[in-house]
C-alpha cells in the first residue's frame, strides 16, 4: 500500500488527479486507489446529517460510512458520492451524478441516482 497519508481519514494512491474545488468530508474514511481521476467540484460525503426538525424538535437521522474509489476510476465534474459507497475498478461516473450506492468495476454509470448504463469490458 503506497498511499501517501495526508489526513488520518484520507488515503490517495499514486498517479491520481483531483480537480479544483472538490470537497472531501472526512468524518468517515475515504480511500482513493491508484490512477483515479476526480474532476472539478466533486463532493465525497462520508456522512449524512439531516439536522433537527423544527416541527418535531428532535434530531433527525445521522449516518457515517466510508467511501472507497478503486484503481482507475474516473469521476466526472460535479459528481456527489454519498457515505458507504464503493466505486469499482476502471469505472466511469458521468458528470453531475449522485452516487448513493455501490457501483461495480468496469462499467459506465451516470444519473440521479447513478445507475450502470454500459459494460466497459
Q: Residues of each region from the PLM?
A:
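Flexible, glycine/small-residue-enriched loop-and-beta-strand segment within the central core
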Residues: 1-12, 17-86, 112-113, 119-121
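Residues that flank catalytic or metal-binding motifs in active/ligand-binding sites
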Residues: 40, 95, 105
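Catalytic-loop signature of eukaryotic-like protein kinases
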Residues: 72, 90, 107
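Beta-rich strand-turn-strand
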Residues: 77-92, 97-101
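Acidic, glycine-centered active-site loop in nucleotide-sugar glycosyltransferases
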Residues: 104-105, 110-113
Amino acid at each position: 500500500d503506497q498511499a501517501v497519508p495526508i489526513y488520518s481519514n484520507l488515503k490517495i494512491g499514486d498517479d491520481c488527479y483531483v480537480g479544483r474545488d472538490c470537497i472531501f468530508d472526512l468524518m468517515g474514511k475515504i480511500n482513493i486507489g491508484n490512477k483515479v481521476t476526480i474532476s472539478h467540484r466533486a463532493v465525497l460525503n462520508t456522512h449524512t446529517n439531516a439536522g433537527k426538525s423544527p416541527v418535531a424538535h428532535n434530531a433527525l437521522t445521522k449516518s457515517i460510512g466510508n467511501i472507497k474509489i478503486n484503481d482507475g476510476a474516473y469521476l466526472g465534474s460535479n459528481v456527489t458520492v454519498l457515505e458507504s459507497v464503493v466505486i469499482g475498478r476502471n469505472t466511469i461516473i458521468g458528470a453531475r451524478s449522485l452516487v448513493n450506492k455501490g457501483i461495480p468495476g468496469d462499467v459506465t454509470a451516470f444519473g440521479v441516482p447513478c445507475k450502470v448504463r454500459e459494460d466497459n469490458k
